[in-house]
């Protein structure tokens, strides 16, 4: 079973920002928010999900998103935002990190798809979609939705900025521990994190969560979602997290819960 990852990058972003002059920071913040919103909308309409890596680079779980779909999104964004171009590198692998590396290598080795100067994919991926109009059957995504258990208690003890400092410290720890499992972690804002984690078992995530809790002295919950596409896996993970909260309200403590959608 494999996962497909797409790396989306704004080309020439640094030089482009300099053209806006020294009073550009507010303009850039507005642009980044608008760009993310439009790109997320284009991907989620196709059952994918998008995460910030850097503000000029984003990463999507793109299971089943064909080469033609990528080309359509590229054209839509280029039409919306005159003066900038985006590139997309597509990769597959047994783990999210492997798929990410495959995507990176397709770009590094300049393996362009036909009809585009900025969409990259291995010959294997191009053949996979050229020979079928259906989504590949062996793709799936597993996502962990992690949050702080009863974060209101923490917010009552610390100021907002101090809370952010603690959360960033925790984010660093979560990234470190999950990249060892060839998984990819993203901060969603608030006290929420998501981990793309195809090959990590429920037992292993419980072990990792316990280690993080012991080092940070904060309780965590983790909803596990599995589905064929990124968007559905995220929905399942969030439903699992909601179930943990519902069980907690009934006096049942189950910090890790999993839901799989077929």
Regions from the language model: what does each represent?
Residues 1-262:
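Regulatory and interdomain segments flanking nucleotide-handling catalytic cores
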């Amino acid at each position: 079973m494999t996962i497909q990852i797409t790396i989306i990058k704004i080309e020439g972003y640094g030089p482009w920002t300099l053209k806006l002059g020294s009073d550009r920071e507010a303009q850039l913040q507005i642009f980044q928010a608008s760009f993310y919103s439009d790109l997320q909308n284009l991907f989620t309409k196709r059952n994918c999900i998008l995460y910030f890596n850097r503000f000029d680079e984003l990463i999507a779980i793109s299971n089943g998103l064909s080469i033609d779909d990528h080309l359509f999104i590229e054209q839509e964004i280029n039409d919306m935002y005159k003066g900038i171009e985006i590139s997309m590198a597509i990769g597959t692998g047994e783990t999210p990190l492997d798929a990410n590396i495959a995507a990176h290598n397709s770009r590094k080795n300049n393996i362009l798809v036909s009809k585009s100067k900025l969409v990259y994919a291995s010959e294997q991926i191009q053949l996979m979609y050229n020979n079928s109009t259906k989504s590949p059957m062996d793709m799936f995504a597993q996502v962990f939705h992690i949050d702080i258990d009863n974060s209101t208690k923490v917010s009552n003890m610390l100021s907002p900025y101090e809370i952010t400092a603690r959360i960033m410290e925790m984010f660093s720890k979560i990234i470190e521990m999950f990249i060892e499992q060839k998984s990819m972690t993203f901060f969603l804002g608030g006290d929420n994190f998501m981990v793309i984690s195809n090959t990590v078992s429920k037992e292993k995530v419980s072990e990792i969560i316990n280690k993080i809790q012991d080092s940070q002295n904060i309780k965590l919950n983790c909803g596990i979602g599995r589905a064929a596409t990124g968007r559905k896996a995220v929905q399942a993970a969030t439903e699992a997290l909601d179930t943990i909260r519902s069980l907690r309200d009934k006096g049942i403590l189950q910090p890790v819960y999993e839901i799989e959608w077929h």
